[in-house]
Amino acid sequence: MTMLIKFIVCFIAGIGAGLGTGFAGMSAAAVISPMLITFLDMPAYEAVGIALASDVLASAVSAYTYGKNKNLDIRNGVVMMVSVLSFTMVGSWIASQVPNSTMGSFSVFMTFLLGVKFIVKPVMTTKNAMEAVDPKKRFVQSVICGVMIGFICGFIGAGGGMMMLLILTSVLGYELKTAVGTSVFIMTFTAFTGAVSHFAIGGMPNLWCLVFCVGSTLLWARIAARFANKASPATLNRATGVVLVVLGVGVMGGN
């Protein structure tokens, strides 16, 4: 496999993953894993490890951008993160026992459906409505939801981004920017844990693919997060929906 082909595949995967992360708090695994598996014939477990590693910096720089614009709920984010992390390791170990084809397809389909939801039924919750929810109720919900997300995160190799965005907007009643900001904040840590456990169980991945994917995802996540924080809620819902639908269709088509 020539270095140029590796670079092109990883760069294009990084564009999709970065835009998905910066706009929607989507895990890079939903895009990077299927592309590496399909076009570079990479084993699924190795591809997921690279995708999670790409997630770490992309999510961190996105979380910083959202936090700087006061679109981040750190208190509940930490609560959810602890329960997510506890179950990421469990999911990752079980994933190592599962055949290649089972992994990835679930997250791709979910990406597409969530994109359609944002276009058809946008999240227009305001920060005032969001802050009116009882803190104790939100705490309990955050713990329960975190356990579910953590297991799925480790199992399908997603930083749980789509699950978190869906739960933060639909179950916990967050407005979209705060939901994405909180999602990428949590994902920074879940993806790091997932990547470390993947590399510990499966060994180090292809170094060049890792470097290319991390660099491209980081660049495009930064661009998307800066745009998202300046956009109006209606524009952001539409942009998020379109990005998710295009990525979902593109990856399903590639498979």
Regions found by a protein language model. Name each.
Residues 173:
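ABC-type ATPase nucleotide-binding domains, specifically the catalytic core motifs of the NBD
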Residues 1-17, 27, 31-33, 37-39, ...:
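Juxtamembrane transmembrane-helix boundary motif
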